[in-house]
């Protein structure tokens, strides 16, 4: 399942009609990106671009205690985004047809990653009606 599908379920469960979903990566050697999701070559090309832009064996790096891929991963994360904001309209994220949300791992080996999701906005009508009924029941 793609990240986009998991986010759709999160937004739906939040019951927001109009608002904003924030996606935040809690790491300094990974980032988030919105990119084309139809052709896997896009992801391969992006990975290759960043590998060439920030290679692992730059002799001038001082932060090397966590391995040769660690400081280049920090630099790649600094060049990209650790958070994304996506508008929500009519209970759905407003993304282009070919846009997908990806966790961009910058280390050579995969690591366990945590992403924080937050939705803020106006509740959908079905939730507003339920909330109004529950307030009427209060003394």
Spans of features found by a protein language model:
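Active-site histidine-anchored catalytic micro-motif
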Residues: 1-139
